[in-house]
Amino acid sequence: ETDTLKAGGSAVDAAIAANAALGLMEPTGNGIGGDLFAIVWDPKTQKLYGLNGSGRSPSGQTLAQLREKLGDATSLPAYGPLPVTIPGTVDAWFELHDRFGKRTMAENLAPTVRYAREGHPVAPVIAMYLDRSLAAYSRREDEFDFSNARKVWFADGSAPEAGDIFRNPDLANTLETIGREGRDAFYEGALAETMVTYLQRQGSAFTRADFAAHDSEWVDPACATYRDGFELCELPPNSQGFAALQMVNILKNVDLAQWERGSPEAMHYMTEAKRLAYEDVARFYADPDFSPTPMDLLSERYGRERFALIDPAKATAYGPGEPKLEGEGDTTYLTVVDGEGMMVSLIQSNYRGMGGGLVPDGLGFMFQDRGELYSLDPAHPNAYAPSKRPFQTIIPAFVKKDGAPYMTLGLMGGGMQPQGHVQVLVNIVDYGMNLQEAGDAA
């Protein structure tokens, strides 16, 4: 990303370049088969912009049809064709680039194309996760066709070892096509045809029209004021970002700094705030196109009501609250700031492990398995439905102080991400830690 900045690229250009490289070098956490969320601070307008780059389910498959495919299963699997949703990352790249980019997309992707052709050393932690992925997929080879993944990452029957030079010429060709032909090559052109043909062969209900219809959504980040002028900003559902804001609105009602960090008292309030917020996550967070989000979840009044339920002496059993519908918004995270002050907070993931194990013919990447998070209960806000985005765990964040940009924030960890965001914020605001200390202690 530093080379991209030195060449005159913006923070968004550098973020795209870095994300592409991570998809090659850390395929166990992210890649162009997954989804992307981002928050951008634009120094020209002095505003935050949010992007929801998550994909949808097949338009022609109903919940009843899905349940018929699942048989006696009570939830969606993590592997195979059924948990696949449209990959949103590539479209999100172009949305970000069209608004904030300076270099061409081909220039942004060129370093990763080169690394994919010439090879790169495999990091120890990636070697470990690749080995785990091989074991997980091998156990399920009677359930779905794992052969394309074997060709890309496990050609000799084993996972690459730490220090091995790994090459992925198929991914190089795919990225080169995207850079040369643009977004439509992936969602409407030959790449889309390859993906849909492969998915249908595996038993998926996706069509060419589903891919052509995909689009990212620009959204307004919402912010909650903590104390001392600090604001935490997150993206709205179908992500879980609002859970962090709910925790902030609960915790602002108690002075955590009166106790030492990590003390039983402080940890009790942190834990109870998380539990209260997560009850609402399970009840209210879903694709707002299907289930409107009660914006009252973010009101200070609602935060006070939830805080009042906490017993300072013991853990308490909670249920979801009753917010008003109208109010009084495995993973790799990266952040880039350029010389003009543009700041990018970007998170991207294939969801569980490398994804669902399916690799389209000759394209060098794996489809995500995010659809595992759909509920099969038709009454649930996150119930599976045609053309619906599933609940998302990945959330970028942004922190302002006295209205000015202060820092970007994000981390891996699935469902604990809102909790992690709040822990970092509390460590900085209440316990005076610097950024490194706050992250290490969280």
What are these regions (language model features)?
Residues 218, 328-331, 392-394:
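Short, small/polar residue-rich loop motifs at catalytic or cofactor-binding pockets
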